[in-house]
C-alpha cells in the first residue's frame, strides 16, 4: 500500500498543477529538522516574498485587473519543465506499483541535502525546480527593466523576491546556461507590462507553493 503521506503530496501537486486559480495562502505545518532543511527555509522565504510582492501589486495595480479571478492564467514553464511529474514521491514513481523503482544515488553539490547524496528521482525534481526558478528569475528581471523605463514610476519588482529566488537557486546549485533577457524596445506598452506582471506573479506564487511543499516533503523524508 502506498504511504498516505506520499499520496497526499501527489494529490496536492496535481491540484496545484490543474487548478491555478485556487487561493493557497495556508502553509504546511512546521516539520522537524532534516537533511533538506536548508532549502526548506529558502523555499519558505521565497513563498513569503512572492506573496508580499503579489499583495503589493494587487494594491498598486487595482485598476489593472490584477486579481486571480480577473487575469488570464499563464504558465511560462509549460512544455519546458515538468516539475509536478519530476517531483513525484519515489513510492509512486513506478507504473504498476508503489515500490521504489530507482535507488541510484547521485552526488549533488548544492546545500539542499546535507549529505550531498540523493536519489536519481530527487535529483530530477530539484533540477526541475531550479529550471523553473531560472525561467521566472530571467522573466522578472526583463520585466523590471521595462518598468524602470515607465515615466509614471508606478511599480517595480521587490528586490527581496528576486533575492529569494537567487538564494534558492544558489542552494540548489545546478550548472545551467543562462542567457540574460533584454527588454524589447519595439513594444513599450507599460499597461500590458503591468498586466503581464500580475499574470506572472499569480503563476509564480502557485509554483512557489508547489516548491515549498516539495521541500517540506524532502526535509521530512
Swiss-Prot record:
Keyword terms: Cytokine, Disulfide bond, Glycoprotein, Growth factor, Secreted, Signal
Listed GO biological process terms: immune response
Molecular functions (GO terms): cytokine activity; growth factor activity; interleukin-12 receptor binding
Signal sequence residues: 1-25
GO cellular component: extracellular space
Compartments reported by the entry: Secreted
Domain of life: Eukaryota
Pfam families assigned to the protein according to its UniProt record, in alphabetical order: IL12
Glycosylation sites per record: 41, 95
Disulfide bonds, paired cysteine numbers: 39-112, 66-198, 87-125
Function in brief: Heterodimerizes with IL12B to form the IL-12 cytokine or with EBI3/IL27B to form the IL-35 cytokine. IL-12 is primarily produced by professional antigen-presenting cells (APCs) such as B-cells and dendritic cells (DCs) as well as macrophages and granulocytes and regulates T-cell and natural killer-cell responses, induces the production of interferon-gamma (IFN-gamma), favors the differentiation of T-helper 1 (Th1) cells and is an important link between innate resistance and adaptive immunity.
Assembly notes: Heterodimer with IL12B; disulfide-linked. This heterodimer is known as interleukin IL-12. Heterodimer with EBI3/IL27B; not disulfide-linked. This heterodimer is known as interleukin IL-35. Interacts with NBR1; this interaction promotes IL-12 secretion.
Protein name in the entry: Interleukin-12 subunit alpha
Organism: Cervus elaphus (Red deer)
Higher taxonomy: Eukaryota, Metazoa, Chordata, Craniata, Vertebrata
